[in-house]
C-alpha cells in the first residue's frame, strides 16, 4: 500500500509532508520551496500554472490569476463576506446556478473545489516526484471552524485532484499532533493552538495525555473566524496605499486591476519586512498614468503605522480565545503551552497580544508554515496502521439539530462534542393523517431555528394515515471522523427510511457563526421567552385538538349549558392562538379556562370508560385522569411533536 500524504491546503500557501519511519519529511516542490503559493493561473493557451510560476505572472494576467479561493469554498454567493471580496478581487466572482460562489477565468465558470484541486494536484505530484511512486491517498486539513459544506467541498476538491481523502483533519489539531510528538515532555498538559493563517483564524484548546504509553490528543473546545487572516492584513495596507496615493496624485488606483495586483504583491512584501524592521519603503514606478504622464508610487510605512491599521483585526482574534477557554472549562492559567500556527503569527503585534491574553510567551520552536502539514502526515501514518501510539479525539465546532413545532431548534448534537458521534431521537407528526414529513437540518447556537443556518432538508414520504402524535419517526444524526454530517429518518411502523449527506449547497460563514453565538448569548433571555411561547402554543393546539375530539365522542352526554361553556372557551383559545401577537400569559389563561370548563367532560369520559372496561378500572382510571388534566391523550414521553409539513404530490 502506498503512503498516505499529509496536505495543508492553505488560503495563501500550501504544504505537503510524509512520514518516513517515525521521521517527518516536508517535501520541496519543483521550484525547491517547502511551501507552495495557493495561486492558480489560467493561460491563453489553456495551460494552468500553479504556485510560484502563477504568482510571478499575476501582475500581467490579473483577471485570470486566482488566489485566496479557499475563502469561497462551500459558500453561497449572497453571503456578505463573498460580496465584500467581489469588490476587492481582480478576478470575477460569480453566482453559480445552485447559488454558490464560483469564479471565472477566460470566460469559463469554475467551482472553488475545482480550483483548489489544482493546488492539491501540485501537492500530489510533489510527493510522487519525491517518493518515485503513485500517491492516491491523503489527509487534508481544514480550519477547525469550517462548517459541513466547506468540509464536504474540500473533500470534493481532493477527489477532483485524484486523491482519496482518508480524513479531513482540523488545522489546530494537526499542529498539536506535530508539537506533541516532537516534544520529550511527559505527563498530561493542556495547550492552546492559536492559528492565524492567510484567510482563516482558529483557536483550539487541546489536552495531550499519556494513556498507557499511547499519546492521546483530546480537543476540549474550538472557536474561530473563517473570514479573518493575513489577506485582510494585506488589504488594510493596500487601502492605506490607495488613500495616500489619491491624496498626493489625485488618482484612484482601486479601479486599476493591473495596479491592484502590483499593490497586493508590495503590501505582502512590506508586511513581512515590518515583522523584522521598524520601517520599509514601498516603491512602485510607473504604477499608473494620466494625461500628464506616468505616475510613480513611493511611500514609507513604519511598523507603528501597520499596527495602527490592523489593530482591530488583531483584537478580533481575542474574543474566540476567551470563548474557547470558557467552553473547555479551563482557566487561562491552566494552559501549559501556547503554539502559534500560520504565517501571520510572525507579526510582533500578534505575538504580543497572544502573550498578553495567555500570560505566557508563545512557543517559538514550532514552524508556523509547516506544523499543520506535519500533523496531517502523522494522522496519515495512524490511519495506515503504521503508527499505534497516537489517539486523536476531535470535536464538532457547532451544535446541530432540526426544526420542531413552533419553529424551535431541537439540538441533536451540541457544539464541542467529540467526533465521530451518533444520536437518534423519536419525533411524531403535527397533523392527523399526515402522509409525509420534511426534516430541516440546522447548524448554530440559537434556540429558535430561524436564528440558525439551514444546512439542508429532505422528505420522508409514505407514512400510513394515523392521528397526530401516533406515527413514530426516528431521526438519526451521525457525524463521521471528518466532521461531515449524515442524517437519516425512519418510520418505525413501516421501516421506510430516507438518508442524506449534507452536500455543499450552502456555506456557513464565520460572521454568521460568530453572530449566532454572540446573538445566542446576548439574546438568551429573548430566546428563552420565544421558546416558552412556542411551548404554550403547542400545548394550546394539542388541547384544542383533544378537546374537540372528546366533544365529538362524549358531547351528547353533557347538558347543553356545559357543552356551550366548553365550546365558548375553545373558541376563545382558538382566537388567542390565531393572533400572532398573543403572549404566553394570554395563551396560558385560555388553556386553563378550557381545562376548567372541560372537567365535566372528563368525568363523563371517565364514567364511560369505567362502564366499558370494568375489568381494567385501575388502568382506565389512570388514563382518564391524564386526559382530564391535559385535555386529551398525549404521545409517549420519548416522542416530541415536530413541525413537519405535508409534501403534496403534483
UniProtKB/Swiss-Prot annotation:
Induction section of the entry: By stress conditions e.g. heat shock.
Region: Disordered, residue numbers: 611-650
Keyword Chaperone: yes
Coiled coil: none
Keyword line: ATP-binding, Chaperone, Nucleotide-binding, Phosphoprotein, Stress response
SUPFAM superfamilies on file: Actin-like ATPase domain, Heat shock protein 70kD (HSP70), C-terminal subdomain, Heat shock protein 70kD (HSP70), peptide-binding domain
Pfam families found in the cross-reference section: HSP70
InterPro entries reported in the protein's UniProt record: ATPase_NBD, Chaperone_DnaK, Heat_shock_70_CS, HSP70_C_sf, HSP70_peptide-bd_sf, Hsp_70_fam
Residues modified as Phosphothreonine: 200
Start-end of Low complexity biased regions: 611-634
Family: Belongs to the heat shock protein 70 family.
Entry protein name: Chaperone protein DnaK
Organism name: Burkholderia pseudomallei (strain 1710b)
Upper taxonomic lineage: Bacteria, Pseudomonadati, Pseudomonadota, Betaproteobacteria, Burkholderiales
Amino acid at each position: 500500500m502506498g503512503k498516505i500524504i499529509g496536505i495543508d491546503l492553505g488560503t495563501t500557501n500550501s504544504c505537503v509532508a510524509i512520514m518516513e519511519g517515525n521521521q517527518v519529511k516536508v517535501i520541496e516542490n519543483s521550484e525547491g520551496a517547502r511551501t507552495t503559493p495557493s495561486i492558480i493561473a489560467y493561460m491563453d493557451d489553456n495551460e494552468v500554472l500553479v504556485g510560484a510560476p502563477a504568482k510571478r505572472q499575476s501582475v500581467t494576467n490579473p483577471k485570470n490569476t486566482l488566489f485566496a479561493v479557499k475563502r469561497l469554498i462551500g459558500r453561497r454567493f449572497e453571503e456578505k463576506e463573498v460580496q465584500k471580496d467581489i469588490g476587492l478581487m481582480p478576478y470575477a466572482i460569480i453566482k453559480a446556478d445552485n447559488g454558490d460562489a464560483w469564479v471565472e477565468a477566460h470566460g469559463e465558470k469554475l467551482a472553488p473545489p475545482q480550483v483548489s484541486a489544482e493546488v492539491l494536484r501540485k501537492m500530489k505530484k510533489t510527493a510522487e516526484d519525491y517518493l518515485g511512486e503513485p500517491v492516491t491517498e491523503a489527509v487534508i486539513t481544514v480550519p477547525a471552524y469550517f462548517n459541513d459544506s466547506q468540509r464536504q467541498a474540500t473533500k470534493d476538491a481532493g477527489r477532483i485532484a485524484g486523491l482519496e481523502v482518508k480524513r479531513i483533519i482540523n488545522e489546530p489539531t494537526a499542529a498539536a499532533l506535530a508539537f506533541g510528538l516532537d516534544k520529550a515532555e511527559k505527563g498530561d498538559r493542556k495547550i492552546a493552538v492559536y492559528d492565524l493563517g492567510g484567510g482563516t483564524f482558529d483557536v483550539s484548546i487541546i489536552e495531550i495525555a499519556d494513556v498507557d504509553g499511547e499519546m492521546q490528543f483530546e480537543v476540549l473546545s474550538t472557536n474561530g473566524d473563517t473570514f479573518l487572516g493575513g489577506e485582510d492584513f494585506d488589504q488594510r495596507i493596500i487601502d492605506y496605499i490607495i488613500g495616500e496615493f489619491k491624496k498626493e496624485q489625485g488618482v484612484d488606483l482601486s479601479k486599476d486591476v493591473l495596479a491592484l495586483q502590483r499593490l497586493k504583491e508590495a503590501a505582502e512584501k512590506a508586511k513581512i519586512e515590518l515583522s523584522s524592521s521598524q520601517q520599509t519603503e514601498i516603491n512602485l514606478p510607473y504604477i499608473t498614468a494620466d494625461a500628464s504622464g506616468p505616475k510613480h508610487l513611493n511611500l514609507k510605512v513604519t511598523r507603528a503605522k501597520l499596527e495602527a491599521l490592523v489593530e482591530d483585526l488583531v483584537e478580533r482574534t481575542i474574543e474566540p480565545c476567551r470563548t474557547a477557554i470558557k467552553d473547555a472549562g479551563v482557566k487561562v492559567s491552566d494552559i501549559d503551552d501556547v503554539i502559534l500556527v500560520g504565517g501571520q503569527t510572525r507579526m510582533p503585534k500578534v505575538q504580543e497580544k497572544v502573550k498578553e491574553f495567555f500570560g505566557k510567551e508563545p512557543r517559538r520552536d514550532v514552524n508556523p508554515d509547516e506544523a499543520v502539514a506535519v500533523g496531517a502526515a502523522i494522522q496519515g501514518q495512524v490511519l495506515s496502521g503504521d503508527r499505534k501510539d497516537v489517539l486523536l479525539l476531535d470535536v464538532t465546532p457547532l451544535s446541530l439539530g432540526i426544526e420542531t413545532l413552533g419553529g424551535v431548534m431541537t439540538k441533536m448534537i451540541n457544539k464541542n462534542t467529540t467526533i465521530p458521534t451518533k444520536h437518534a431521537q423519536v419525533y411524531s407528526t403535527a397533523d392527523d393523517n399526515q402522509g409525509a414529513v420534511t426534516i430541516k437540518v440546522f447548524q448554530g447556537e440559537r434556540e429558535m431555528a430561524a436564528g440558525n443556518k439551514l444546512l439542508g432538508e429532505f422528505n420522508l414520504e409514505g407514512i400510513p394515515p394515523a392521528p397526530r402524535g401516533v406515527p413514530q419517526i426516528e431521526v438519526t444524526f451521525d457525524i463521521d471522523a471528518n466532521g461531515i454530517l449524515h442524517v437519516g429518518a425512519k418510520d418505525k411502523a413501516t421501516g421506510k427510511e430516507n438518508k442524506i449527506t449534507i452536500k455543499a449547497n450552502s456555506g456557513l460563514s464565520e460572521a454568521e457563526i460568530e453572530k449566532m453565538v454572540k446573538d445566542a448569548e446576548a439574546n438568551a433571555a429573548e430566546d428563552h421567552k420565544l421558546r416558552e411561547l412556542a411551548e404554550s402554543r403547542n400545548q394550546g393546539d394539542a388541547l384544542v385538538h383533544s378537546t374537540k375530539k372528546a366533544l365529538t365522542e362524549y358531547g351528547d352526554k353533557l347538558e347543553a349549558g356545559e357543552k356551550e361553556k366548553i365550546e365558548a372557551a375553545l373558541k376563545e383559545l382558538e382566537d388567542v392562538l390565531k393572533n400572532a401577537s398573543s403572549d404566553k400569559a394570554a395563551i396560558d389563561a385560555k388553556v386553563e379556562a378550557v381545562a376548567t370548563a372541560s372537567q365535566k367532560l372528563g368525568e363523563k369520559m371517565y364514567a364511560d370508560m369505567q362502564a366499558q372496561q370494568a375489568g381494567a378500572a385501575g388502568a382506565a382510571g389512570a388514563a382518564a385522569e391524564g386526559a382530564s388534566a391535559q385535555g386529551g391523550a398525549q404521545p409517549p414521553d420519548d416522542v416530541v411533536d415536530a413541525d413537519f409539513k405535508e409534501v403534496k404530490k403534483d
